[in-house]
Design a protein with these regions (language model features):
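Hydrophobic ligand-binding cavity/cleft-lining segments
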Residues: 2-91
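Glycine-rich portal/gate segments that line the openings of hydrophobic small-molecule binding cavities
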Residues: 4, 43-46, 84-130, 185-197
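Hydrophobic/aromatic beta-strand elements that line small-molecule binding cavities or substrate pockets
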Residues: 51-54, 83-85, 110-116, 137-144
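Beta-strand elements of well-folded, non-transmembrane domains
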Residues: 56-60, 99-103, 116-120, 132, ...
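Short, well-ordered alpha-helical segments
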Residues: 64-65, 69, 175-179, 186-187
Length: 198
């Protein structure tokens, strides 16, 4: 962890907006932007719980496959510069991720190390063990759709406690935007990989 880093506001999956580094190909259509439901809730002073949800028209197992291909995440998640597995002291799953983005005409980056717990095929919990936040934890929840067509309700929830170097209002706004874009990128990736197979 280095002092010159500013929180990237999205530990593992980063974000957009014009002056901040927009990814226009994923938000060109307002209908896409509305496909993601985002809720923000203060949980303590300078701490926020942010939850984003999306419907993906592919089975849970295929969404799980995309989420758990950890080393490939940087190839399709906006502004995620690096995602790689590290050796875990007890044999679990540990990731190092580096996000970069342009914020107010400056480039910022953040490095985090996450420990993950997988509960196949419905839940992935993560907790930051080292990085540029005071605390960052959350989960991915995958539930099968009850509709006739196979589908997945994907829910991404994070609890963030930023360091004092970044105003919490900016982080809240950034994370909400980031999470929306990340879920759209995941849905797009799942559809690219599996739509022709179904």
């Amino acid at each position: 962890m280095t002092e010159q880093h500013q929180p990237n506001l999205e530990l593992d999956f980063a974000a957009h907006t014009n002056d901040w580094g927009e990814e226009p190909n994923l938000v060109a259509e307002p209908a896409l932007d509305q496909a993601v439901e985002v809720q923000t809730q203060p949980v303590a002073e300078r701490q926020r719980q942010i939850t984003a949800k999306i419907q993906i028209l592919q089975p849970v197992e295929q969404v799980w496959q995309v989420l758990t291909d950890y080393e490939a995440l940087a190839s399709f998640i906006p502004n995620l510069a690096k995602s790689r597995r590290l050796e875990h002291p007890t044999g679990g799953i540990r990731l190092e991720q580096v996000g970069t983005q342009r914020l107010l005409r400056f480039n910022f980056s953040a490095r985090v190390v996450l420990d993950l717990e997988e509960k196949f095929p419905h839940e992935i919990n993560f907790n930051m063990v080292e990085g540029d936040f005071k605390a960052f934890s959350g989960s991915w929840l995958l539930k099968p759709s009850l509709a006739e067509q196979a589908g997945t309700h994907l829910c991404y929830s994070v609890r963030v406690w930023p360091k004092l170097t970044m105003p919490v209002a900016i982080i809240e706004r950034r994370l909400s935007s980031d999470m929306r874009l990340n879920l759209l990128a995941i849905r797009q990736r799942v559809e690219q990989l599996f739509a022709t197979a179904s």
